[in-house]
């Protein structure tokens, strides 16, 4: 254990590993797939729209969070040219983000509303309304029934699959664009 921590290993994959408490005292933790999932918020929202039979260019997507953080801003930038309406519900930095998106993409953002076809929550306090809602926070992200796959890689059990993809992504062996959401 000591040597593992000394040599810089900070991630372990097995979900059902029985000694997490002992390893946590040595500074080790299970793999958290949330950074990868949050970086893929826009492609996942588009996949939700496709699954519902919605044309993204005729659909509304809401982004909800307590602040205009990096992943929320990235999702907004990626979705602006791809959806009819982008709705923001962001307490801190939301107005600034709206002005930025208007300058960059010439879009007038809509107020958030319960009838959006897809919504992405970046914070547990954000509203859950919408036809399909991704919740990308906390220890268990809710992907609204989406499955994550990589062409050419045999899919494992969901609990073990996402941490594996996170490790491949963090080490540069997998790009966000390699992922498929269905």
Regions found by a protein language model. Give the residues of each.
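Metallocofactor- and cofactor-centric catalytic cores in central/energy metabolism, strongly enriched
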Residues: 1-21
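Structural motif
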Residues: 13-17, 63-67, 88-92, 120-125, ...
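Short loop/helix-cap segments at secondary-structure boundaries that form the rim of catalytic
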Residues: 19-27, 96-101, 126-131, 141-144
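A glycine-rich, Thr/Ser-enriched phosphate-binding loop motif common to dinucleotide/cofactor-binding enzymes
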Residues: 29-45
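A short, basic/flexible loop-to-alpha-helix module at the beginning of a structural domain
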Residues: 43-58
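Glycine-rich phosphate/diphosphate-binding loop of Rossmann-like nucleotide-binding domains
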Residues: 54-115
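Short, well-ordered secondary-structure micro-motifs within conserved domains or adaptor modules
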Residues: 111-142
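Adenosine-phosphate binding glycine-rich loop
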Residues: 132-182
